[in-house]
A protein has these predicted regions:
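Conserved class I S-adenosyl-L-methionine
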Residues: 1-40, 42-51, 58, 143-170
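Class I SAM-dependent methyltransferase SAM/SAH-binding core
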Residues: 52-98
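A short acidic, Gly/Pro-enriched loop at the edge of an enzyme's catalytic core
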Residues: 100-109
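A short glycine-rich, Lys/Arg-flanked "PGG" loop and its adjoining helix->strand segment in the class I
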Residues: 126-138
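Short alpha-helix
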Residues: 183-201, 207
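A C-terminal cap/extension of S-adenosyl-L-methionine-dependent methyltransferases
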Residues: 206-260
C-alpha cells in the first residue's frame, strides 16, 4: 500500500489540499476539532495517515505536541519539507503495526483525517480501534474523519453519468478508488459500524457530517469556476453540520470517541 501512496504524494496537495473544495472541507473539520481541543486537556497528539502534513502543521501551530505518521515514506518526506517546528515529529509508521512503534508513549488525542482509515478492512479497523485505546491516556479522545457508504453526491454523480453499476459501489468491500491515477482498495464504513466496532473500548461523543452540501473533491473542475454556487453550498453546509443523522449521506463524517 505504501508504494501506491508514494505515487500520490507528489500531487496530493494540488489535487486536494489547495483546491477550493479541499480547503472548505478541511476548515469544517478544523471548526469541530478546535472545539474538541478547547474542551479537553490535550497536550500530546498522534496523527494517523498524515499525508503531506497539512493537519499536523496546523495542530502544532496551536502549540500541541504532535507525532504525525504515514505509511508512505514519500508522503512523510513531502511533509518534512514544509516545516521545522520543534513540537512536530513526522514518522513512517504502518497503521497495522500499532502500538508497536510507541512502546512507552501515551497520547491525549489520536486523529485521522479524510478517509485514511478507509484503506483498512473491517477487521483491520476493529483492530486499530482496540490498539488506539491502548495508546490513549485516561479519557483520551479519538477523532476520525471517515468516508461512509451512502454519499448522496456520489450516487447522484453516477446517476447523471448513467453509470448505474457504480451508484451503490461504496456498499461493496475492497472498492477500487482512484487516488491521483493510482488504484487503491478502499472500504467504506457508516457511523453505526464504527461505533459498534469501538463499543468495547469507547463511547461516542460527537458525530458531524463533512461534505453533505459541499461536494467531493473529484468535482473540483466543475465547481472551481462557480464561486457563487460554492458560497451557497457552504452556507447550507453550516446548517447541515447541526444534524448528525446526515453523516452517513455526506462525503465524509467526523466522529469523536472517548476512551472508557
Amino acid at each position: 500500500m505504501n508504494a501506491s501512496f508514494d505515487i500520490a504524494a507528489a500531487n496530493y496537495d494540488n489535487s486536494f489540499t489547495h483546491t477550493v473544495i479541499g480547503k472548505l472541507q478541511r476548515n469544517l473539520v478544523y471548526r469541530h476539532l478546535r472545539g474538541i481541543l478547547e474542551e479537553n486537556r490535550i497536550q500530546n497528539i498522534l496523527e494517523i495517515n498524515c499525508g503531506t502534513g497539512e493537519d499536523a502543521i496546523w495542530l502544532a501551530k496551536q502549540n500541541y505536541t504532535v507525532t504525525a505518521t504515514d505509511i508512505s515514506p514519500l508522503m512523510v518526506a513531502v511533509a518534512e519539507k514544509k516545516t521545522n517546528l520543534e513540537n512536530l515529529n513526522f514518522r513512517q509508521v504502518d497503521i497495522n503495526r500499532l502500538p508497536q512503534p510507541f512502546p512507552d508513549e501515551k497520547f491525549d488525542l489520536i486523529f485521522s483525517n479524510f478517509g485514511g482509515l478507509n484503506c483498512l478492512t473491517k477487521t483491520e479497523l476493529g483492530q486499530f480501534l482496540k490498539n488506539a485505546s491502548g495508546l490513549l491516556t485516561q479519557n483520551g479522545q479519538l477523532v476520525l474523519v471517515i468516508m461512509p457508504k451512502n454519499t448522496l453526491w456520489e450516487q447522484l454523480y453516477f446517476l447523471a453519468k448513467a453509470d448505474f453499476k457504480s451508484v451503490f459501489r461504496r456498499k461493496k468491500e475492497n472498492v477500487v478508488a482512484n487516488v491521483d491515477g493510482e488504484n487503491i482498495k478502499t472500504n467504506y464504513f457508516n457511523p453505526k459500524e464504527v461505533t459498534h466496532l469501538a463499543s468495547a473500548d469507547f463511547r461516542i461523543r460527537l458525530l458531524k457530517p463533512i461534505g453533505f452540501f459541499i461536494p467531493p473533491s473529484y468535482l473540483e473542475p466543475f465547481f472551481r469556476s462557480r464561486p457563487k454556487l460554492v458560497s451557497v453550498l457552504h452556507s447550507l453546509e453550516n446548517t447541515a453540520g447541526k444534524h448528525s443523522f446526515l453523516s452517513k449521506y455526506a462525503d465524509h463524517y467526523l466522529i469523536t470517541l472517548q476512551k472508557k
